[in-house]
From Swiss-Prot:
InterPro entries: Oligo_trans_STT3, OST_IS, OST_P1, OST_P2, STT3_N. It comes from Pyrococcus horikoshii (strain ATCC 700860 / DSM 12428 / JCM 9974 / NBRC 100139 / OT-3). The record marks D57, E350, K576 as: Interacts with target acceptor peptide in protein substrate. The keyword Disulfide bond does not apply. Residues 513-515 are annotated as: Interacts with target acceptor peptide in protein substrate. The lineage of its organism: Archaea, Methanobacteriati, Methanobacteriota, Thermococci, Thermococcales. The gene is aglB1. GO terms for cellular component: plasma membrane. The keyword Metal-binding applies. This is Dolichyl-phosphooligosaccharide-protein glycotransferase 1.
Amino acid sequence: MVKSKVKKVEKGKEGEEKRSTYVLLKKVLIPILVFGFAIYAFYLRHLTAGKYFPDPDTFYHFEIYKLVLKEGLPRYYPMSDAPFGSLIGEPLGLYLLPAAFYKVVSLFGYNELQAFLLWPPFVGFLGVIAVYLLGRKVLNEWTGLWGAVVLTVSTANFSRTFSGNARGDGPFMALFIFASVAMLYYLKESNKTRKIIYGTLFVLLTVISLGAWNGSPFGLMVLLGFASLQTIILFIFGKLEELKKFVKEFYPAYLAILAFGYALTFPGIVKIGGFIRFAFEVFLGLIFLLVIMLYGGRYLNYSDKKHRFLVVTIIVLLGFGGAYAYVGPKLFRLMGGAYQSTQVYETVQELAKTTIGDVKAYYGVESGNGLIFFLSIPGLLILLTKYLYDLFKKAKSDNETLFALVFYTMSLYLLYLAVRFLFLASYAVALFFGIFIGFSMDVIEKMKENIGIKAALGIVLSLMILVIPFVHAPVLARSARALKNTEIEVTGWEQALKWLRSNTSKYATATSWWDYGYWIESSLLGNRRASADGGHARDRDHILALFLARDGNISEVDFESWELNYFIIYLNDWAKFNAISYLGGAITRKEYNGDENGRGRVTTILLTQAAGNVYVNPYARIVIKVIQQNKTRRIAVNIGQLECSPILSVAFPGNIKIKGSGRCSDGSPFPYVVYLTPSLGVLAYYKVATSNFVKLAFGIPTSSYSEFAEKLFSNFIPVYQYGSVIVYEFRPFAIYKIEDFINGTWREVGKLSPGKHTLRLYISAFGRDIKNATLYVYALNGTKIIKRIKVGEIKYMNHLEEYPIIVNVTLPTAQKYRFILAQKGPVGVLTGPVRVNGKITNPAYIMREGESGRLELKVGVDKEYTADLYLRATFIYLVRKGGKSNEDYDASFEPHMDTFFITKLKEGIKLRPGENEIVVNAEMPKNAISSYKEKLEKEHGDKLIIRGIRVEPVFIVEKEYTMIEVSASAPHHSSE
C-alpha cells in the first residue's frame, strides 16, 4: 500500500511537472509565434511598395502628410478644386501619426516617401499584435494566437493595410484595439499604480484613434454601447456594488475621452466634433438613467429582476423617443456618410451595400468561400452561450465577454451597410474565429486523457487551422505583387502627367474623370491643380459627366469658369461609362444598374479588337462581323448564340454608314451603334453613341448636330498622347473653319499666305458667350510676335448660336499666324488660405449673405495683369427628367451649372508674375444666394436637386484667347 501511494504521488508530481512545462512553453512560444506572424503580415503588406501608390486616395494623403511635415498643422490644400484649393477635411491626426513614424525611421536613413510606404504595413503589423492581446484577454492564449494568424492573411484586413494604401481606418482600428485591451486591464486591475497606467493608456490611445479617421465614431459607439449594456445588466441582476465600481472606473474615463477629443477639434487634429457632442448628449442620458437606477428605489419598485427590467425598458424607450424628436431620422444612421444616397455615391463601388459575394471574397481562403467569416459564427455562439450561462446561472456579467460581443455585433452591422466596412469588421471576425479555435483548444486541454493524447489532438487541430495561412498567404502574395505594378505605370498616365508637369505653367489646371484628380495633383506625377478629384468638388463630377456623356449644345460646359487649361481623356474609361452616363443624365437609373430584379441594365460602351475581318471581345463573348452579300454589306454582332443587327454601323476611314434593324435573332431590341476602325470596334448604346467621350477617346467625328464634332475638335486640341491617355489643350474660343474669298468664291483653307485677305471665320464658343471682344491676328516667326493686327470686334455672340465673322486683313510675311480673341475672363489660382476677418474660410464659399469684413487672398499668375476682383456665385444642380420621384427607376438627372457675378469688390488691382497678396474690404449682399435658390425651386419644384452652391473670389482681366494657329504658305493670289 505504501509503495502504491508513493507511485501515485510520483506520477502526480510527474503530471504536474509536465503541465507546468506545457504552460510555460505555451506562454513563451505563443507570443514568439504571434510576433513571427506579425512580421510576416508586414512582409506581405510591403510587397506592394513601388514607385507609386496602388490606391488613388493615398496620393492625396501623401501630399497632406508632406504639408504636415512642412507646416505642422496645415488647414489649406491648394491643388484641389482648381483654381481655388480647399480646406483640409480629414483629421490631421491621420497625418501626424505617419509623420511621427517618419521622424523615427528617418534616423535609419528612410526618406519621406519610403517611410510613407512603410507606414501601412507597420499598421498591419500592429493590428496582428493588438488582436492577439485582445484575444488572450477575452478568452485565452489560443484565441489570441489564432486571431492573429487569421488576421495576418485576411484579404479584408490586407485591403486597407498594404503599402500604398494609407487611409485612416487602418491606424484607427489598430489604436482602438490596443485601447480596448488597456480598458479591459484597467477595469480588472486592483493594483493602484497599474490601474492608473492602464487607465491612462485607455484614454490616450482612444483619443489618438479619434484623430486617425473620420469614421472613428464607431469606436465611441462601441464603448458607449458596452457601457450602456453593462450598466443596465448589472442593475437588472441586482449587482449594485459591481455597478458602482464600473461606473466609478469607466464613466470618468469615457468623459475624459470626449473632453480631450473635443479639445483636439480646434486645431483640426480631430474632425468629429459634431459626433462627440452627440455622444456626450447620449452619455448624459445614460447618466440620467444611472441616477434613476441608483436612487429611484425610494419611489419605484426594484424588488426583483422583472420590475427592474420594466423600469429600464420604460426609461430607455422614453429616451429613444426624446432623442428621435431631438435628432430626427439620422439617429439611426450611424456612419451614414458611408452610404449617402446621392447619384455620385451610387456609382462608387466601395460605398455600395455589401453582398454575400463580397463577404465570401474578402473572407475567403484561396477562393471566394468566406471560410474565415463563417468560422467566426461558431465563436459568436460559443461566447454568447458562455455569457448567458454566466449571467443567468451566476448573475455574472463579464466585461471582457460583453465588450467582445458588442464589438462583433457593431462590426457586423457596419459590414452589412457598405463594402468599405469589410476591412473594419476584419478585426472582430478574426477575434471570433480565434475564440472558436481557442475554445476548442481549451476543451482539449481540459480532457482527462493523458497529456500525450491531448497534445496530439491539439497538434492535429493546429495543423488543420494552419492550412489557412499556408494556403492563402501565397494567394495574397501574388495579389500584392500584381498591385505593385500600378495602373499609372502600365497605361500611359505616368508619361502623360510627367509631360504635363514639364511642359505647362506651374499655375496650370487640368482635369479628367474625377478618379484621376489625385494623380494630376500629386507631386510625384503631374503636380498641377485639378478641377475634381476623389474627395473635393464632388458637385463638379456631374458637370464632367455631362460633358463626357452628352453631345451638342447641352454638353457645352463653361470650363473657362474653372480656368481649365487641359482635359485628359483616358481610353479605358469606357469600362466606367455606365456610371459616367448616369451622372451626366444620358441614361436612367434602370439603364445604369437595373431595377430591383437587376433587369433593364445596359452596357453603354464595349470595345472589340480587330482580328482579320472580325472584331472580337472574348470576355464579353462578342464578335462583330462585316458580311459582304452581293454588292451590299451588313454588320452582324454575335453575342453568344444570338446574332444582332445594330441600328447603325459606321466604318472608318471613309465614314461609310450601314443601317441595320436594331434587333436580334430572337426578336429582342438591340439599340446599339457600331463604329469600326482598322484596329478597333466600338459598340455604343444609342443614347451615348455620339457622346463627346466617343469623339475624344477614339477620334470618331460623330454627332447628332451639324458641325458640332468639328467645333469640339477645335476647342480641344490634342497636345500629347501616350498609351491610353490623351492630353487635350482646352480653348474656350476657337475657329474651326477658315474660308478665304478667292476669285469670287469662298474656299476653305488650312494655310494663309502673306497679302490681302477677306476671311470668313467660323467660331466655336464652348460654354461661354462672347461679349465686347476684339479679334487680332498675330504674325509670328518662331515664338516671336512680329506684328499684331486688329481685324474686328464682336459685341455679343451666344455660345449656343454662333455665326461666322467676315474680316479683312493684310498679312505680313511670317512663319505662322495666330488668331486671338481678347475679352474679359478669369485669371489666377489661389496659393494660400482665404481669410475673412483673420479667420481661415472655405475658398469656394468665402462669405455668407450679409457678411462683411477684411478679405485676404494669395493669388498666383504667370504674367502682369490689371484685374478687378469679384464675388461670383456658382450653382450646380440636377433636374429630374422622367420618373415620378428621384428614386424612380425611370428617372434620369440632367446636370446644370449656372454662374453669375454677385458684386465687384475692387478694381484696378495690379497682379505681377508669381504670388500676390491681396487685401480688400468685402461685403456679401443679402439675398444674393437665397433669391436665386428660390428662383430655381420655383422653376423646377420637386425635380430640383442642388448639388453645390459656391461663392468664389474671381479676378477678371482683359484676357487673350488663342483661337487657332495656321501656317504660312507662299503668296499665290490676291483676295477680291
